[in-house]
């Protein structure tokens, strides 16, 4: 490195020699060049270069197309695309073979794992109405069961008390008498549902918040509002149960909304239990 400092860049162009290229016996080339650094000092750079030829095997037709004579604005240009006249598209890799079956299988397995994780982290859901409580504590358990069992209960007479106590006959625990000879209280049957309405023909997009805030907002407050959902998919089954604060509010909602349209469907409102 030279210690002299060049004061003028114009003088530097005259003093910097041209690069020297020397061919070595081993086939490499030694290139000696000079340049100026940030301090204006002349720096000597020595590079040893080895030329390597890489042969690429392509289809004969592809090699033939590369040797075609170019025309128009590309006339007399070297082989290959010119970025001044050619816009390069996205590179697409085409993989041929049977490995795509294995890839699809791996994707399906990953989806199954995600579903399993989702089920494991899912919140508590009632198997009867789909609400966020235990099935044994479902407030509408007797109502939902009665919808499907009313016909069978009407055709099947209740067994007599004497038959219950007949020796050798099994009596369910909930039908056995206690130590004082009294039958157990039927809490669900005796529960007061005088302020509960069943709303059917609901659109599948309707949830509990839409019931409270949109459809029944002016009839609130509510003790509970539950949209009955499918046990497996979690989708709405098209009806819900809403318990109002007073019987008058429930009757007002029944008279105002029964037969009205809501999200492209005609609502049907009725009392959750037949009134005497």
Curated annotation (Swiss-Prot):
Keyword line: Cytoplasm, Initiation factor, Phosphoprotein, Protein biosynthesis, RNA-binding
- Compartments it resides in: Cytoplasm
Any GO BP: translational termination
Stored Pfam families: eIF3g, RRM_1
Q: List the disulfide bonds.
A: none
Q: Which residues carry this modification: Phosphoserine?
A: 148
Location of the RRM domain: 195-274
Q: Name one GO cellular component term.
A: eukaryotic 48S preinitiation complex
Task: Give the superkingdom in one word.
Answer: Eukaryota
CDD domains reported in the protein's UniProt record: eIF3G, RRM_eIF3G_like
Example of a GO MF term: translation initiation factor activity
Q: What role does this protein play?
A: RNA-binding component of the eukaryotic translation initiation factor 3 (eIF-3) complex, which is involved in protein synthesis of a specialized repertoire of mRNAs and, together with other initiation factors, stimulates binding of mRNA and methionyl-tRNAi to the 40S ribosome. The eIF-3 complex specifically targets and initiates translation of a subset of mRNAs involved in cell proliferation. This subunit can bind 18S rRNA.
The entry's family comment says: Belongs to the eIF-3 subunit G family.
Q: What interactions and quaternary structure are annotated? A: Component of the eukaryotic translation initiation factor 3 (eIF-3) complex.
Q: Which PANTHER family match?
A: EUKARYOTIC TRANSLATION INITIATION FACTOR 3 SUBUNIT G
- Name-wise, this protein is Eukaryotic translation initiation factor 3 subunit G
Q: Which gene encodes it?
A: TIF35
């Amino acid at each position: 490195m030279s210690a002299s400092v060049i004061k003028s860049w114009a003088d530097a162009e005259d003093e910097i020699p041209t690069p020297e290229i020397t061919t070595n016996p081993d086939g490499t080339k030694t290139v000696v060049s000079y340049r100026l650094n940030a301090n204006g000092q002349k720096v000597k750079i020595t590079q040893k270069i080895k030329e390597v030829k890489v042969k690429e095997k392509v289809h004969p037709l592809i090699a033939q197309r590369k040797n075609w004579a170019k025309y128009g604005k590309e006339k007399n240009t070297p082989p290959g695309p010119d970025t001044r006249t050619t816009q390069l598209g996205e590179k697409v890799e085409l993989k041929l073979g049977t490995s795509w079956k294995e890839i699809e299988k791996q994707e399906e397995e990953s989806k199954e794992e995600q579903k399993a994780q989702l089920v494991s982290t899912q919140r508590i859901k009632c198997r009867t109405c789909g609400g966020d409580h235990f099935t044994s504590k479902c407030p509408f358990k007797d109502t939902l069961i009665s919808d499907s069992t009313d016909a069978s209960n009407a055709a099947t007479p209740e067994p007599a008390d004497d038959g219950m106590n007949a020796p050798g006959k099994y009596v369910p625990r909930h039908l056995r008498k206690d130590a004082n000879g009294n039958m157990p209280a039927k809490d669900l049957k005796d529960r007061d549902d005088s302020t509960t309405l069943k709303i059917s023909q609901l659109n599948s997009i309707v949830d509990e918040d839409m019931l409270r805030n949109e459809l029944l907002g002016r009839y609130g407050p509510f003790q509970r509002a539950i949209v009955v959902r499918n046990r497996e998919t979690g989708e709405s089954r098209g009806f819900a149960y809403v318990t109002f604060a007073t019987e008058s509010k429930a009757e007002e909602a029944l008279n105002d909304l029964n037969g009205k349209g809501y999200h492209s469907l005609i609502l049907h409102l009725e009392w959750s239990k037949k009134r005497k």
